[in-house]
Amino acid sequence: MISIDLNCDLGEGFGAYQIGNDDAILPFVSSVNIACGFHAGDPSIMRQTVEKALQHDVEIGAHPGFPDLIGFGRRIIGVSPDEVYNYVVYQIGALDGFVRAAGGKMHHVKPHGALYNMAATNLEIAEAIARAIHDINPKLYLYGLANSAFIQAVKKYELRLVQEAFADRTYQPDGTLTSRTEKYALIKNEETAIHQVLQMVQEGKIKAMDGTVITMHPQTICLHGDGEKAVQFAERIYRTFRLNGIFVCAPK
């Protein structure tokens, strides 16, 4: 039987501001990435989100990003590998405190936004992230873009990479994600997104924007929880997998 992890970014509100419907999407995912206070999240939201994730028995990961609340961590920032290391250690440590306090165990780390995209093509940045994870807990998985620089980075630090693909994003011929500044970066048609996901999981391939066929064998699929129909889409993908004999579970 084919198995696949479904992950979602959660806890991305801040103070009085709420983004996404975390409660409604939790039943349809097997792992979650929780914002750690830099691009989104705050101590109260982090604690609440950790406790909800544990109640739903999903695996918990840290979702470190750039210290850029206004830009939601999606803006490129000129940083050194040492700064990236510090950012990631700080954020993993913050979330891990809440996970431990709630009686849980952290499962993985998945960088957010611009940090994620930079690491996918910049080996020094990817290695800084991998080193941070290794120095805190080398048993943690690293969730990173399939076919990217993350592969070399985890080999250097002997970590376990979970190769990730996106349900609602388009791809460039080199396997990178289409920038969110581009018109067709997001797939808004549900049927198209479902077809793309099944093609990736069942056939190990995906079509880039120009029609190029890319070989890809993802182990986890990212769902975005902040879209207008995010919950409906998450439920549909979950049920589509079940109907096609695909078992939804996080890496163990």
From Swiss-Prot:
Cysteine pairings via disulfide bonds: none
One GO BP annotation of this record: carbohydrate metabolic process
Entry keywords, A to Z: ATP-binding, Hydrolase, Nucleotide-binding
Gene3D superfamilies (UniProt xref): Glycoside hydrolase/deacetylase
SUPFAM superfamilies: Glycoside hydrolase/deacetylase
Pfam families membership: LamB_YcsF
One function term, GO molecular function aspect: 5-oxoprolinase (ATP-hydrolyzing) activity
Keyword Membrane appears in the UniProt entry: no
EC number(s) recorded for this UniProt protein: 3.5.2.9
Catalytic reaction(s) noted: 5-oxo-L-proline + ATP + 2 H2O = L-glutamate + ADP + phosphate + H(+)
Enzyme class, spelled out: hydrolase
Highest rank taxon of the organism: Bacteria
Function statement: Catalyzes the cleavage of 5-oxoproline to form L-glutamate coupled to the hydrolysis of ATP to ADP and inorganic phosphate.
UniProt family annotation: Belongs to the LamB/PxpA family.
HAMAP family per record: PxpA
Quaternary organization: Forms a complex composed of PxpA, PxpB and PxpC.
PANTHER family: 5-OXOPROLINASE SUBUNIT A (PTHR30292:SF0), UNCHARACTERIZED PROTEIN YBGL-RELATED (PTHR30292)
Name used for this protein in its record: 5-oxoprolinase subunit A
Organism in which the protein naturally occurs: Bacillus cytotoxicus (strain DSM 22905 / CIP 110041 / 391-98 / NVH 391-98)
